[in-house]
Amino acid sequence: MSHVSNSTDEVVRNYLAAKSMVTSLKAFDQESSFAKEANYQVDRCIDEMTDAIDKHDVDTLCAMWESWNARVFHSLDTEGIKQAQCYEASAYRLFLVRCVQKKNISKCNEFFRKMSSLTLNNPQWADWFAFPYNHHAKDTEPFRKYFDKTWIEIYYVSLHNFLSTSLANVSPSVIGTIVEGIARDPTGNDHVDFDEDLIDDFAVIAQCSAPVKRGHSKPSLRNLLKSLTSSKKPSPSTD
């Protein structure tokens, strides 16, 4: 899928250049470079999660998982979604353990209030309501492993790998899908409806990149992108 990403980046760059958006183009190049080098910033995501746990920041922690579920994990298969739910539950339990270790019981109560939709009437969470008041939780199932440093380290490594893999499988953007289709079948007639303003904007790019034959009807975005990609291809040798 890397060629699709590169083609999409090129379309965006051409668009910004056509609009003379020099500052935006520079910012886009910087952000694209940073995203690639940081491997979608997985390391930073994990750091932010551990920081939220250490600071007893339930709002940030829950918001992060809500974002991951909506933007990344939603595209997984059934088994993958179940795995994501297990990682999420473990993150919340590590949060509770950290709060108990720091004797911040009020944050535990805050968590249960805000996450009642997840924890109430859920057999997997039944034992955890009494956890903040269990003085021997460290040596009691099912809490014991969440105090184990080795298990915690393995959890974070596993979560990092899972998040990296999930990000790699995220469905490409609409434009990326079209570009991939053009590369796979240059003569295809797939039809997709787009907003007219979007088509007009990309018509500007096409005019700057390659000649486009005009008819009485508005050109399709697919054909405009096709003109862009075809203009990049080397001409066949006549030797």
Curated annotation (Swiss-Prot):
Database matches in InterPro entries: ARMC9_CTLH-like_dom, WDR91
Disulfide bridge positions per record: none
Keyword annotations: Cytoplasm, Endosome
Disruption phenotype: Coelomocytes contain larger early and late endosomes enriched with PtdIns3P. Delayed conversion of early endosomes to late endosomes with early endosomes retaining PtdInsP3 for a longer duration of time which may possibly be due to a delay in either the turnover or transport of PtdIns3P out of the endosome. This leads to continuous fusion of early endosomes which continues until rab-5 is displaced and rab-7 is recruited. Double knockout with sorf-2 results in a similar phenotype as the individual single sorf-1 knockout.
GO process annotations (BP): early endosome to late endosome transport; endosomal transport; negative regulation of phosphatidylinositol 3-kinase/protein kinase B signal transduction; organelle fusion; positive regulation of early endosome to late endosome transport
Location(s) in or outside the cell: Early endosome; Late endosome; Cytoplasm
Subunit structure as annotated in this protein's UniProt entry: Interacts with sorf-2; the interaction is direct. Interacts with bec-1.
Annotated family: Belongs to the WD repeat WDR91 family.
Protein name: Suppressor of organelle fusion 1
Source organism of this protein record: Caenorhabditis elegans
Taxonomic classification: Eukaryota, Metazoa, Ecdysozoa, Nematoda, Chromadorea
